[in-house]
Regions:
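Alpha-helical cap/lid subdomain in secreted, periplasmic
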Residues: 1-121, 125-143
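A short, charged, Gly/Pro-tolerant segment at domain boundaries
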Residues: 144-148
Length: 148
């Protein structure tokens, strides 16, 4: 792997998050950390494997606590949603489709990371719910429910 493409979860990643937090606060912003979305990593129809981001999630949670920054745990919410949907039904949220399904993307795709529109809306709604649950300034930034 190319070491310029990643950081170590419990060192440079945490340092980078703390830099973002400090810069946000220095500019009178209200930082909030949002854990990464889980990838589709099913071992069978209903059981997810250990996610690729689990160390980064733990590091982010530690950073949030240490720096007194609110956190939306999208990782846990998305894991629960994936387990509920199951391996087959969760494909509809990700770039997972057969050859010829899309004119602009005619080849087959089994991408368990990137989202289709429905997946983006589904997981973004979890972030909105998490921000609403934080209350205060975070909830105040949200629009009332709208139909997409």
């Amino acid at each position: 792997e190319d070491p310029t493409r990643y950081t170590e979860p419990f060192s440079t990643y945490m340092e980078n998050l703390e830099t973002f937090i400090r810069v946000a606060r220095d500019h009178s912003a209200y930082p909030v950390l949002i854990t990464p979305l889980e990838r589709r990593c099913f071992m069978d129809e209903k059981h997810l494997g250990i996610g690729a981001h689990s160390d980064y999630v733990a590091a982010m949670k530690q950073t949030a606590e240490k720096n007194n920054v609110p956190l939306v745990d999208l990782y846990s919410m998305s894991r629960m949603e994936l387990k509920k949907a199951g391996e087959k039904n969760s494909r509809r949220w990700y770039m997972f489709f057969p050859e010829g399904e899309y004119k602009n993307h005619p080849e087959k795709s089994e991408d368990n990371t990137h989202l289709r529109y429905d997946g983006a809306v589904n997981f973004a709604s979890m972030i909105a719910r998490g921000l609403r649950e934080l209350g205060g300034i975070y909830a105040d930034m949200l629009l009332d429910d709208i139909n997409l």
